[in-house]
Amino acid sequence: MDLKEVMAINLRRLRHAKQMTQEELADSSGLSARYVGAIERADVSASVTVLGRIADALHVEPADLLRKTTP
């Protein structure tokens, strides 16, 4: 699993834990809902800047989005 897929899984998990929709996360982070969806599907790689904006919107550390978890 590459880092893009790890971020996709963590982003979806953290967003659901905060009970946020993709649209709400997009609004909070200044991104489009389409782009948030693409990140969650691992269709695109997020830049470090975008990673920081998403982490801020979710009130987590950027590393939380990149941390590999064991199944």
State the predicted function of each range:
Residues I9-S28, R53:
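Short basic helix-loop element that most often maps to the first helix and adjoining turn
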